[in-house]
């Protein structure tokens, strides 16, 4: 089925058709997320929970492009690679 290009509505037209209460709530939620992201970004590097290279942090990364058993999983502690599985 081919759509008529003249009947397509833009994203702005879809946004205008949303209930005003939902638009306000969505906008306030987006503002709250932005404000909290800016707050976390300005935190001291030692207390920032999203800083990757904090002390005593261990995390695993999985490379799905490699076959199983050939160094697919990497374990990193304190910014140094500990083990590859």
UniProtKB/Swiss-Prot annotation:
Cellular-component GO terms for this entry: extracellular region
Top-level taxon of origin: Eukaryota
Keywords on record: Secreted, Signal
Protein's cellular compartments: Secreted
Signal peptide as annotated in the record: 1-35
Principal location listed in the UniProt entry: secreted
Name of this protein: Putative uncharacterized protein DDB_G0284813
């Amino acid at each position: 089925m081919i759509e008529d290009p003249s009947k397509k509505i833009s994203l702005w037209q879809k946004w205008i058709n949303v209930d005003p209460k939902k638009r306000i709530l969505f906008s306030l939620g987006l503002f709250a997320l932005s404000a909290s992201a800016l707050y976390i970004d300005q935190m001291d590097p030692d207390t920032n929970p999203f800083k990757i290279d904090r002390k005593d942090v261990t995390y695993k990364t999985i490379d799905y492009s490699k076959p199983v058993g050939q160094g697919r999983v990497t374990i990193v502690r304190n910014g140094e690679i500990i083990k590859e599985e």
